[in-house]
Curated annotation (Swiss-Prot):
One of its GO terms (cellular component) is cytosol. Keywords: Amino-acid biosynthesis, Aromatic amino acid biosynthesis, NADP, Oxidoreductase. It comes from Nitrobacter hamburgensis (strain DSM 10229 / NCIMB 13809 / X14). This is Shikimate dehydrogenase (NADP(+)). Shikimate binds at S21, R22, S23, T68, N92, D107, Y223. One of its GO terms (molecular function) is shikimate 3-dehydrogenase (NADP+) activity. The active site is at K72. The lineage of its organism: Bacteria, Pseudomonadati, Pseudomonadota, Alphaproteobacteria, Hyphomicrobiales.
Length: 285
């Protein structure tokens, strides 16, 4: 809840359990930079207490919130979602519009904003190839369609999940079995990994990067480790890359703007601050 240490406007992160998050570090950096009196807390809310907490968010002292696992789908149902949140099926940012508590999903802006910053012109180079068909994949696909990408190949080990997502988003999205990767890689201007493969403790992603065009961009939503084996291999081949930390930073921009009235920038200083935090072991809380 809001405390004496968070006088002024305050937002929070709602999750269960409340594991270590970099969101307070990011938002407190921006609050200091813009001279705004306020704060950003972590609130550990169990599923059975979520509805009460969200319905009385302002009573608890908050002007808005981020939502993380396992609450994103339920938060969508408890608020007034925008088109993005409805299409993705999950809300990660809550804010007040008058007395109405609205929700959106800023993963789209995080993904696209990161690509624009890390690889300008990425959207002018061929088809997009997306690996994985989970919640993160929905945000990626929505963003690619919104940007105007005409052909999105969606690869998943479970073909039924890829087909279901393709059915939702229409003819632009073409489901593909993992065995068909080799046929699509030569014409993919953008490769996006939305799976957990390559994450710390997970096996690396096995993919034939030499088949990609030399001007292709490779993006990975994983940010621990900061440079996944996929990104390291892509960089070694001279391909442009976009890492998961960049997406994390860019997705936070819109929430801060909605809550505190200033649109912050993702600066090298902020990135260095979060990179330093990533190198520190943090036990789950």
């Amino acid at each position: 809840m809001m405390t004496a240490e968070t006088k002024g406007r305050a937002a929070c992160l709602i999750g269960w359990p409340a594991a270590h998050s970099r969101s307070p570090l990011i938002h407190h950096y921006w609050l200091r930079l813009h001279g705004i009196a306020g704060g950003y807390n972590i609130e550990a809310i169990p599923p059975e207490g979520l509805a009460e907490f969200i319905m009385h968010l302002s009573t608890h002292g908050f002007v808005g919130a981020n939502v993380t696992i396992p609450h994103k789908e339920r938060a969508l149902q408890l608020t007034a979602p925008d088109e993005r949140a409805r299409a993705i099926g999950a809300a990660n940012t809550l804010y007040y519009d008058g007395k109405t508590l609205r929700s959106t999903n800023t993963d789209v802006e995080g993904f696209i904003g990161n690509l624009d910053a890390a690889a300008p012109g990425w959207d002018r180079t061929g088809d997009a190839l997306v690996l994985g068909a989970g919640g993160s994949s929905r945000a990626v696909v929505f963003g690619l369609i919104e940007r105007g990408i005409k052909r999105i190949h969606l690869v998943n080990r479970t073909m039924e999940r890829a087909q279901a997502l393709a059915d939702q988003f229409g003819a632009t999205v073409m489901p593909l079995a993992w065995s068909g990767l080799g046929d699509v890689l030569p014409r993919a201007g953008l490769l996006v990994n939305t799976t957990s493969l390559g994450m710390k403790g997970q096996p690396p992603l096995d993919i034939e990067l030499p088949l990609l065009p030399l001007d292709a961009v490779v993006a990975d939503l994983v940010y621990v480790p900061l440079e996944t084996p996929l990104l390291a291999a892509a960089r070694a081949r001279g391909l442009r890359t976009a890492d998961g930390l960049g997406m994390l930073l860019h997705q936070a921009v819109r929430g801060f703007e909605l809550w505190f009235g200033q649109r912050p920038a993702v600066s090298p200083e902020l990135r260095a601050l979060v990179e330093a935090d990533l190198r520190i072991p943090h036990p789950a809380t």
